[in-house]
Amino acid sequence: MPHTIKKMSLIGLILMIFTSVFGFANSPSAYYLMGYSAIPFYIFSALLFFIPFALMMAEMGAAYRKEEGGIYSWMNNSVGPRFAFIGTFMWFSSYIIWMVSTSAKVWVPFSTFLYGSDMTQHWRIAGLEPTQVVGLLAVAWMILVTVVASKGINKIARITAVGGIAVMCLNLVLLLVSITILLLNGGHFAQDINFLASPNPGYQSGLAMLSFVVFAIFAYGGIEAVGGLVDKTENPEKNFAKGIVFAAIVISIGYSLAIFLWGVSTNWQQVLSNGSVNLGNITYVLMKSLGMTLGNALHLSPEASLSLGVWFARITGLSMFLAYTGAFFTLCYSPLKAIIQGTPKALWPEPMTRLNAMGMPSIAMWMQCGLVTVFILLVSFGGGTASAFFNKLTLMANVSMTLPYLFLALAFPFFKARQDLDRPFVIFKTHLSAMIATVVVVLVVTFANVFTIIQPVVEAGDWDSTLWMIGGPVFFSLLAMAIYQNYCSRVAKNPQWAVE
């Protein structure tokens, strides 16, 4: 008799989706870029991207629940191996860009924890500019993570848990402190409520506002992993759709509420119009403002209010540093494992698929470390201020993260056309509904990326930013095609490799 695995309840599923998708740092970024006008964009992205895409992934995950290759298997069985590999490689490469971005950003919370504010823009060593110093620290961080992770990731599981709990507590702090400030200030908001216009001078045009959609989509990132939870859920034919829709509503409300609450304590013009504020430190700037506003509402002295704000920023810095650390150790290994161990072995040179004594693909991990290091040095020594550096990396990560969604969405109609699959969970019962969902998701993701990429050129003639945003995804797409073509050539000469 087979061993019975305990299934997840509906509540457990909802919590799992919430923890996987919801990120504390997303609402501060949204408030900085768009103010209250970010809220309609977050709701729009949930309705036209998050919910339909999650349901599509749920269907594919249920039908391919016995496959070990994750999204590679889904696309391979639906469309074909070449399409699947390029799509999966883009998914993997988005995490390469994420590592390039985050290895630099991780020093912002560390600096905030030590000094009470972001001092990374003032770090100068041996004649190097701050951007270059942060770049070298990012390289050191990447090497350290690879050394530790290649010996097994079990040691950092506790840090990941602590970081996750700390960030969840930050959401609670934002809610309770904001309510307290509202009560003490007689319901007065620091920011005037306006859902139609952004207070940010850089986000006044229609083109710039449309490009913000990519930030909203990024906030819902990671939903492709939800499909893998179908077989672990009680009564998936009923509970899975309920769980996804309910979680999506809660997450949508949660993001919108968080953006709304930032306006309780922070006036955009007074606090965020400063040139030193950027997407890398906005979370800590807002948390410091939250603490200072609480101090003022409690009629503390200016010095005490400032001190309270600094401690809010420091606690946030520590929490975010722990969260980044846990995420970094996990994500430097998990996507690489999928692309190396989920795809045919003949795709890769033999050493890359070799596992060390700890069961880790250490050679591939060091090759990944080298690639990330090259990107870090290229960006950090390419000129520009620290503020532009962080903003550029964030945009690169957003574009790269959302491109793999196109591959998964485009594979969905092919998946629906197959007649030989056991489908325990079906939400799109007609060909028309499946096509509508596919078209809507593809259009939303495509337009978001196109608008984001062309906006710097159209508004400021800034070809540099546009080329950086395009460069990462294009490079990895070409690399994927080259790797797959090499695989085809090797299999043609040695057909037995195709079945390995």
UniProtKB/Swiss-Prot annotation:
Its main location: membrane. NCBIfam families: PRK15238.1. GO terms for molecular function: amino acid transmembrane transporter activity. Keywords: Cell inner membrane, Cell membrane, Membrane, Transmembrane, Transmembrane helix, Transport. Belongs to the amino acid-polyamine-organocation (APC) superfamily. This is Inner membrane transporter YjeM. It is found in: Cell inner membrane. One of its GO terms (cellular component) is plasma membrane. The keyword Cell inner membrane applies. It comes from Escherichia coli (strain K12). The chain crosses the membrane at residues 8-28, 38-58, 83-103, 133-153, 164-184, 210-230, 244-264, 320-340, 370-390, 395-415, 434-454, 463-483. Residues 29-37, 104-132, 185-209, 265-319, 391-394, 455-462 are periplasmic. Residues 1-7, 59-82, 154-163, 231-243, 341-369, 416-433, 484-500 are cytoplasmic. InterPro entries: AA/rel_permease1, APC_superfamily. Pfam families: AA_permease_2.
